[in-house]
């Protein structure tokens, strides 16, 4: 039994932030009904290549992007722009606990699928809206995309090498981190609202903004500015407040050292056979190492050119100083620790019984995550869900009219 068994989610979202939230809820046992456009589906279904191979190794038209964020969901293809399609959504909403949507602010009101409309049908509903900029403010009605928000929020100003270094300049993060974080925060907010409902008997509205989330997630960098009045700058792979905490080039390739305290730095110097560094008062305390970073780092950089990355990692790891390699994704998924933790899971797909995906990191002792089904084909569950309140004949008529899509019988 999943932790959220018995919770029904009407998922009107698409692309990443909303679907990421929905997938987490589904992994935890909620019934997540994903509404998609007939014959088209979620935009990310076409965000390929790469495409998922079928059982024989032939490429399907199921994108890797869609597969990463839609497992354990039920796909129902309904045209919500029509009155008949809206009526179908109302029927689902009547018994839903949660609604997730990420349309532009105000867009769903014209279809009477906004919070005001659905909460009249079901006052217990928890309704989560995810937008780029929130429901109010001067930019509320604008669409928001992860890349744009990474720039606006200040994240890109602290990501990448300084301008005066080769290859320097603002960089986005390698995954859509704002969307993913917003999905996580939305999941937390939804679960909080469900707990509140158990006390008050009422649902509520949740207003989530990508920009809000990423500004909140500036964490120490945002606080550093508020504390000092100085805007943090791009430092490549270095840390603004801890030294040494960065990548270093060995004889063959780069590796990472992350000394979080003075004892770890002392142990590092012992591990790499460089005790002379400890005789210099400039390097004993972290606050001084930060101040004299430009003296310490060149010394370490020169020293690390003497051996391979593996040799250094093994030596440093032996004294329990945080150290690591820089893996490709291929190497990361083959990492023994990742394999042991079962992060790559097999879920039979209708097109490929050997379908693999990256699983949930959540490990619950009593109500573990379960993988009931792979990401669905478009409209795969239309008949299964809508037959709860429509006959096969009625569904066939709706399909003929283009209101719904998917196999009916």
Which sequence ranges carry the predicted segments?
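Conserved Rossmann-fold dehydrogenase catalytic segment
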Residues: 135, 165-176, 198-214, 233-240, ...
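Oxidoreductase and adenylate-handling cofactor-binding alpha/beta cores
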Residues: 161, 183-203, 216-227, 269-276
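Aromatic-enriched alpha-helical interface/lid elements that frame and gate functional surfaces
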Residues: 243-319, 323, 395
């Amino acid at each position: 039994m999943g932790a959220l068994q018995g919770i029904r989610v009407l998922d009107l979202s698409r692309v990443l932030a909303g679907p990421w939230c929905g997938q987490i809820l589904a992994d935890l046992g909620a019934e997540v009904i994903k509404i998609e456009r007939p014959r088209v589906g979620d935009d990310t279904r076409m965000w390929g290549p790469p495409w998922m191979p079928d059982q024989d190794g032939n490429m399907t038209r199921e994108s890797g992007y869609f597969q990463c964020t839609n497992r354990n969901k039920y796909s129902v293809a309904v045209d919500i722009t029509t009155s008949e399609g809206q009526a179908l959504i109302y029927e689902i909403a009547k018994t839903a606990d949660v609604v997730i949507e990420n349309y532009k602010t105000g867009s769903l009101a014209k279809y009477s699928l906004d919070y005001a409309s659905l909460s009249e049908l079901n006052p217990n509903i928890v309704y989560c809206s995810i937008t780029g900029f929130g429901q109010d403010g001067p930019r509320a009605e604008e669409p928001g995309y992860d890349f744009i928000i990474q720039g606006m929020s200040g994240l890109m100003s602290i990501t990448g090498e300084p301008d005066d270094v080769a290859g320097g300049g603002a960089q986005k993060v390698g995954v859509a981190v704002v969307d993913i974080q917003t999905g996580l925060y939305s999941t937390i907010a939804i679960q909080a609202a469900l707990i509140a409902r158990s006390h008050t008997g009422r649902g509520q509205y949740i207003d989530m903004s990508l920009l809000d989330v990423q500004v909140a997630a500036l964490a120490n960098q945002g606080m550093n500015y508020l504390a000092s009045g100085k805007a943090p700058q791009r430092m490549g792979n270095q840390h603004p407040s801890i030294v040494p905490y960065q990548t270093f080039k060995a004889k063959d390739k780069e590796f990472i050292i992350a000394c979080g305290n003075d004892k770890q730095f002392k142990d590092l110097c012992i591990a790499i056979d460089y005790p002379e560094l400890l005789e210099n008062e400039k390097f004993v305390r972290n606050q001084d190492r930060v101040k004299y970073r430009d003296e310490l780092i060149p010394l370490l950089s020169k020293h690390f050119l003497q051996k391979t990355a593996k040799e250094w990692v093994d030596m440093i790891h032996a004294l329990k100083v945080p150290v690591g390699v820089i893996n490709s994704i291929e190497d990361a998924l083959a990492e023994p620790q990742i394999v042991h933790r079962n992060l790559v899971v097999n879920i039979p797909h209708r097109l490929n019984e050997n379908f693999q995906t990256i699983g949930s990191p959540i490990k619950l002792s009593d109500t573990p995550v379960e993988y009931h089904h792979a990401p669905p084909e478009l409209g795969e569950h239309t008949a299964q869900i809508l037959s709860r309140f429509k006959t096969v004949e009625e569904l066939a008529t709706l399909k003929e009219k283009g209101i719904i899509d998917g196999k009916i019988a």
